[in-house]
Amino acid sequence: MKIIFMGTPDYAAHILEKLLNTKNIEVVALYTQPDKPVGRKKILTPPAAKNIALKYGIAISQPSRLRDKETVAEVTSIECDYIVVAAYGQILPLEILKHAPCINLHASILPHYRGASPIQQTLLHGDVKTGVTAMLMNEGLDTGDILKIKEIEVDADEMSESLFSRLTEVASDLTIDVLENFVQYTPKIQDDSLSSHCKKITKQDGEVEFDNATAIFNKYRAFTPWPGIYLTSGLKLKKIELFEKESQNESGRILDIQKDSIIVGCKKGSIKVITLQPESKNEMSALSYINGKRLNIADTLS
């Protein structure tokens, strides 16, 4: 079967490579986002999916707007059986949706967490399970009919990188399953009354206050490595653990100093802070930081 693949980040790149190494599947073209400047030096960097396509010698297109007439004409001129979409970053116009069945791999149990940050939302909400949904795309955002859902459990202390890696493997296998057994699956309409939406993560989302220890820890799980979590002062909490969930404390008060960490109170619960990073400085142990600031038990970390 012939496939047009549309995807951009690592998640998409892994799925693309799985397709390229599967018998009876031919990826005839990749559509991905344009190269973007990255880092302080603004080095023009290709998306992860493009690197895979270059490795395997696949035709690559990087339109700024998939909706442009020229791009739509180009896509619809390519003979294919399916279009597979994974974290592409653009909405597919109706003309392309009609060209071939468009199958999207979304990293949540739809209709929960439609949108740009489903993995982070899973961790922010402390969910104990998540999954990948294969769906037939329509003109809405993650609103298409569901073909199959593969669920996995989420560990209580699992970080975003680990969950991302596991969901990527699930999505890769699910893609092959759905393509090879497409006619066996009956599309199921999503229940919009159960839907929730999630936006793109910004740097500002990483700001925390010592209100709820569980919420802080979940933000840490979701936002490591980026954007990280930090106090209003700019002090970054680089490595933390949830110490306990229920105690009531003064916000930010140092409750205990241990041999490798400090225990910081929240209005509800407390966290163990192992390393910190002040603005414009390197990461350091929490002990080194409080010693430098001459902070002790009952003082406030801020």
Swiss-Prot record:
UniProt KW keywords: Protein biosynthesis, Transferase
InterPro entries cross-referenced by the UniProt entry: Fmt, Formyl_trans_C, Formyl_transf_N, Formyl_transf_N_sf, Formyl_transferase-like_C_sf, Met-tRNA-FMT_C, Met-tRNA-FMT_N
Pfam families noted in UniProt: Formyl_trans_C (PF02911), Formyl_trans_N (PF00551)
GO molecular function: methionyl-tRNA formyltransferase activity
Signal peptide boundaries: none
Any one annotated GO CC term: cytosol
Gene3D superfamilies recorded: 3.40.50.12230
Residues reported to bind (6S)-5,6,7,8-tetrahydrofolate: 108-111
EC number: 2.1.2.9
Enzyme class name: transferase
Record field: catalytic activity: L-methionyl-tRNA(fMet) + (6R)-10-formyltetrahydrofolate = N-formyl-L-methionyl-tRNA(fMet) + (6S)-5,6,7,8-tetrahydrofolate + H(+)
Keyword flag Aminoacyl-tRNA synthetase: no
PANTHER family in alphabetical order: METHIONYL-TRNA FORMYLTRANSFERASE, METHIONYL-TRNA FORMYLTRANSFERASE, MITOCHONDRIAL
NCBIfam families with a match to the protein in the record: fmt
Record function comment: Attaches a formyl group to the free amino group of methionyl-tRNA(fMet). The formyl group appears to play a dual role in the initiator identity of N-formylmethionyl-tRNA by promoting its recognition by IF2 and preventing the misappropriation of this tRNA by the elongation apparatus.
Family of this protein: Belongs to the Fmt family.
Name of the protein this chain belongs to: Methionyl-tRNA formyltransferase
Organism of origin: Sulfurimonas denitrificans (strain ATCC 33889 / DSM 1251)
Gene: fmt
